[in-house]
Amino acid sequence: MSMEGVFLEKTKTNTTTTLPDLSLHISLPDIHQYHHNESSKESSRRSSQLENNNRSSNFELSLSHHNHPTARIFHCPDRRTLNLPHQQHYNNPIINGVHQRVDESEISNLHRPIRGIPVYHNRSFPFHQQNSSLPSLGGGDMDQISILNSSSGYNNAYRSLQSSPRLKGVPLHHHHHHNQYGVVGSSDSSSPHHHNHHHHGMIRSRFLPKMPTKRSMRAPRMRWTSSLHARFVHAVELLGGHERATPKSVLELMDVKDLTLAHVKSHLQMYRTVKTTNKPAASSDGSGEEEMGINGNEVHHQSSTDQRAQSDDTSLHQETDISSTQPRWSNSSRETWPLSNNCSSDIDTMIRTSSTSMISHYQRSSIQNQEQRSNDQAKRCGNLSCENPSLEFTLGRPDWHEK
């Protein structure tokens, strides 16, 4: 029979005078004392169970040496011991009376500071904000602990966590995820410098325009109209003619928008070619009027290249024909140039015709040189036969074959 709650009372008697009272007085135990004994037993049983479970789930978070005597051990309870409060009430209804007292003791044990890592009780744990399904670090007992606040403390904690093989219920890839994007610290306005630098770097690389590409140095194609050519001729005449004019000075005198030095240089070169090939007759008044045109220039250039192979009569005949068919133009700015506006295409055709004429001239000259060489060789031989000499020779007397 259990003797709990049974109190034996002995009456004070004088042993010398009377006999001792050996009667038993049985009464009901005190209710408050009974609940106190039950709660103490349950708390001791629960604390022993926690100690047995914590032996397999302890890992060191100290940043000091392993042999240092002041290193502290952070006890991470097992997943089974960190059930939600309502699950504990359903599974063990006897502990309902002492649950609040046990939670306070657990919180006091879990809130012990870790050496090397600051502990702040007014901020929530960062893993609990990001993922509430992490039981060992994001539970209700740990939501008031903030292990890290700066990037340096965060990196040190990450190195110490990497030393252990595996956290109970916390995979390390979540930790690496937070470190990669710089989402560290609490939810207040203070954010790490690394996160700000990374964020601004992404914005700078995304929204800034690229470096401007190098502009092509080739000038755009220019169409020389009649009025533009008249202005060009007027500038050349003011500078003393095509022989003394320079492209830069002509460009300054023309003062035309979007006209480059390359345009003036090419046009002046073509103008000099036309002026040198076509020998104009100087007028008495010095106005310098010539009879020329685009097609006339082509024929003049072709006739000048073919003068060596043709006679003077044919060249004069071509000039008279061209002068009678083509209109005349003046180099003064008051008159217009009644020719085709597509000067560039005419220049290309003129270059092609001049090149073909030069090739034909060289072919004719080579044929003439060959004929001249053959004639010289015939003159050297004269009337003598140029056959191969006989290489036969005899020894002794020439008539020994006959004998």
Curated annotation (Swiss-Prot):
Induction: Repressed by AS2 in adaxial tissue. Residues 274-286, 321-343, 362-372 have a biased composition (Polar residues). It is found in: Nucleus. Signal peptide: none annotated. One of its GO terms (biological process) is adaxial/abaxial axis specification. Residues 216-276 form the HTH myb-type domain. Residues 35-45, 298-320 have a biased composition (Basic and acidic residues). Residues 247-272 bind DNA. Pfam families: Myb_DNA-binding. Transcriptional repressor that regulates lateral organ polarity. Promotes lateral organ abaxial identity by repressing the adaxial regulator ASYMMETRIC LEAVES2 (AS2) in abaxial cells. Required for abaxial identity in both leaves and carpels. Functions with KAN2 in the specification of polarity of the ovule outer integument. Regulates cambium activity by repressing the auxin efflux carrier PIN1. Plays a role in lateral root formation and development. This is Transcription repressor KAN1.
